[in-house]
């Protein structure tokens, strides 16, 4: 049966860079995304989706919809070419199809704290070629991914797919994801930054200095006024930056449990970095490229700074300075002012 023209299915059929196993896997992910979009759009009519039902192996509180989403994805992927399945909601990688050739890591429901307040939430996924064991399949640099993507469940349900050669955006309409763009690119200039400013006192001096220089506006080193954004949903932040530019910062800080950042490298940061680089942006841990980092454990955390390449490079420059040279007054001394 031929897929309807302009749909995700027809896109996968026509893209020679997408192997058959990957196409089958992405189609299964899209099927679950459509199902979840329906569940989410009905909100409390489907029960208390934001109710806490326990904690995952890493200590994060699980909401009912976290568990539902994880079970839906694992079930739909079981008959596909996915050999290894790694989820935020499960302690270890699990074998789905012994004959499979792919390994898929996933955050089934990103931003679940926003469920009850009707703010955009999403799904993030990463695909590797499978190795003999689950550990080998996922504890490798993100640059070895063959595909990554995310879904935003918001006013529109959007599916973003990145492969090694393509980056495409699809929107759900009447049971199908339709292609709306295959030329996404993060704008080269930005006047927006996203960070949770309530944690300012816990940040390192380079992060505080960068934010201070943004807040200084047209009196600071950038010579223009900035707006701050914060949604507490990584997919929502990513999609805004992919659409209109900006920089996102979730740094390490001095609080207990935040010394290595809070976001997970394997199934959050690496796939987002893969997408961002495909769109012409940059993604680092504040210093080093995310896609060059090799995780030592499945649920490893890392700081994350991504977005418009110029601004991400400037954050790295703040970290390169001697500690004595970094202060909230740094900008007025003119490293970036002509």
Curated annotation (Swiss-Prot):
Binding, Mg(2+) 1: 88, 107, 109
Subcellular location per the Swiss-Prot or TrEMBL entry: Cytoplasm
Binding positions for substrate per the UniProt entry: 110-113, 196
Gene Ontology terms: cellular component: cytosol
Cofactor(s) the record lists: Mg(2+)
Pathway this chain belongs to: Carbohydrate biosynthesis; Calvin cycle
Key word Iron present: no
Any one of the GO BP annotations: reductive pentose-phosphate cycle
Keyword field contains Chaperone: no
Highest taxon of the lineage: Bacteria
Keywords: Calvin cycle, Carbohydrate metabolism, Cytoplasm, Hydrolase, Magnesium, Metal-binding
GO terms for MF: fructose 1,6-bisphosphate 1-phosphatase activity; magnesium ion binding
Cofactor note: Binds 2 magnesium ions per subunit.
Main location: cytoplasm
HAMAP family xref list: FBPase_class1
Oligomer and partners: Homotetramer.
Name of this protein: Fructose-1,6-bisphosphatase class 1 1
Species per Swiss-Prot/TrEMBL record: Bradyrhizobium sp. (strain BTAi1 / ATCC BAA-1182)
Source taxonomy: Bacteria, Pseudomonadati, Pseudomonadota, Alphaproteobacteria, Hyphomicrobiales
